A protein has these predicted regions:
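Interface amphipathic segments
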Residues: 1-230
Length: 230
């Protein structure tokens, strides 16, 4: 595409080891004035997912990438989306005998969005957390009346089918600030738990106009799906 014709990119990659055991891998990608990305990794038993042990770290600075909007296929979408002048990404990922994990933080315009999680597909177990600290949604979607967000989400459990007895999960969400249209809709909390096909939880909102407090209860089985609010 013409927008990329005058952008210089440098790439460096090195690896040592075998296809089964990679002792060290390094990757560097840079584009003057726009991109600096570095990553390193190592892995053992790479071809066996149940025995694989691997770790990786990455960090990158992304500057003045607004020109990339020209690559979007929709003119309307190009008008709605923005790319902050500086975006920083830091994180790590790993695998340990069937369990996969990641932790990363994205920073832009004075705010941060962090993700941390662990997942084992064989055991169907998961533990994930998302946190936003003064994260500027308006820096990415300026036309949607969105503003700053402060929130924390956490989910953990075992099993994916909510109708099975073995499935257990808990969810907690706390939204301290959620700006929309110049107003703060924060103060929402959600706690929910599913255990032995029994659902329980509560929803609250400290907004003076709502003062919401709801209890959630229910039963989830293959024969009956019932959820009530009180």
């Amino acid at each position: 595409p013409p927008v990329l014709d005058d952008r210089t990119v440098r790439l460096s990659f090195s690896a040592a080891g075998t296809l089964g055991d990679i002792g060290k891998t390094q990757l560097e990608i840079s584009s003057p004035g726009h991109l600096d990305l570095k990553a390193d990794a190592a892995a053992k038993n790479l071809l066996d997912a149940n025995r694989m042990e691997a770790s990786a770290r990455f960090e990158g600075d992304f500057r003045d990438l607004a020109f990339l909007k020209a690559l979007l296929p929709d003119t309307v979408l190009r008008r709605r989306v923005a790319i902050p002048a500086l975006i920083r990404l830091r994180g790590s990922a790993g695998a340990d005998r069937g369990t996969f994990s990641t932790a990363s933080t994205l920073s832009a315009d004075g705010g941060e969005l962090s993700v941390k999680g662990r997942f084992n597909p064989r055991e169907q177990s998961y533990d994930a957390a998302i946190r936003a600290d003064s994260f500027p949604l308006n820096s990415f979607l300026p036309a949607d009346s969105l503003g700053i967000v402060d929130l924390a989400l956490q989910a953990r459990g075992t099993g994916f089918d909510p109708l099975l007895p073995r499935t257990r999960t808990s969810l907690r969400a706390q939204i301290d600030r959620a700006e929309f249209g110049g107003r703060d809709f924060g103060g929402i909390e959600l706690d929910a738990e599913l255990d032995s096909q029994r659902l329980s939880g509560r929803i609250s909102d400290r907004d003076e106009a709502l003062r919401l407090l709801l209890s959630v209860s229910g039963t989830l089985t293959e024969r009956e799906q019932r959820i009530g609010l009180s």
